[in-house]
């Protein structure tokens, strides 16, 4: 039996294949809680407008809370005609409280109803993802605090560039995820615009005070000012999908670093067994699958953004059924990212760092810039100093020695002012300590930033 919210003008039942194509309850059932929250607020607005009496209002609220409880405890039983979450809730509500349920949809369209549901849902997932990102930042911060003095190669073009500290590397990703959190919080401000009361597209003619709805739904702090835009706007979904995709890109970059650093060729870190897998053929293998999946799943997050934007790009005002396609990309991105962030935080918290392998990867050529800086201190223009050091690097390569072991005569042949003091430059810890500008890799600056982030993440957000 069908329980459609429409159909009076139709003389034929919906074809079975059309129902399968059209119905969305199988995926939009996760909107049950926010749908019921919106319906309770709507019932309050109906009561205030005198469209239902106190007894009907009480029955609606009681029945809706019973339906909410059924969804929460897993006892809700779908019916064959449950086209979507709105139909399912109203059908079950009528079974529980009788014909009073028939008044709930007075003056309301599924267009403004689902727009409200989606805004409530996206607010909730944005906050959830913000919490997950904080957990990841804390895992990175703990590693940074342990390794403020741990030296490692820093890379550009995946080539050894200059020495840095592993703590500084961890802090870089904390900053990256901080921007993601800022974007989430900023997006929430645009989600908190209430479309309820806009009707199908033109507004409400039954005396509903929309201002009252913002009091009943305290997640919203302003009303949508144009009913046409209110029911057709899905910018907020596109925005959070983009933010999810960008978080995924940042996770992918983090994962790529860890995959490299965990390889035998680097050996800088080792992932815990709990976040690695093996090979069905090669007994010796320990694969960084947690990181590879983070890297791989970033692609589906990007795909979900494109999916929604493609749906929206050609839609005329106002609501169109195409908009039903906003939900699965959103739900998929949230599910993927919510679990991925948990895995990332746990994998980082439990990984083992090998400072000795990091130190062994350092080489004197990484201090070539320090040598150029020394020439600058002697009054030589940097571009000239750069060229002289390039000559010294080439000469060391020709002789098959490191810069540290290049004879003084070779140094003086390129720059006569150099003396034996030049060899003091070849001290990795000294080099790193000199990078003491704000935001630099010097251990004192890394410790300073660790304290800053500890205050932000633990004390300010406790």
From Swiss-Prot:
Q: What does the sequence similarity comment in the record state about its family?
A: Belongs to the lyase 1 family. Argininosuccinate lyase subfamily.
Q: Give the Pfam families listed for this entry.
A: ASL_C2, Lyase_1
Q: Which Gene3D superfamilies match?
A: Fumarase/aspartase (C-terminal domain), Fumarase/aspartase (Central domain), Fumarase/aspartase (N-terminal domain)
Q: In which pathway does it act?
A: Amino-acid biosynthesis; L-arginine biosynthesis; L-arginine from L-ornithine and carbamoyl phosphate: step 3/3
> What is this protein identified as?
Argininosuccinate lyase
Family annotation (PANTHER family): ARGININOSUCCINATE LYASE (PTHR43814:SF1)
Q: What is its EC number?
A: 4.3.2.1
Keyword terms, alphabetized? Amino-acid biosynthesis, Arginine biosynthesis, Cytoplasm, Lyase
A Gene Ontology CC term for this entry? cytosol
- The organism is Chloroflexus aggregans (strain MD-66 / DSM 9485)
Q: Which reaction does it catalyse?
A: 2-(N(omega)-L-arginino)succinate = fumarate + L-arginine
CDD domains, per database record: Argininosuccinate_lyase
- What are the protein's GO molecular function terms? argininosuccinate lyase activity
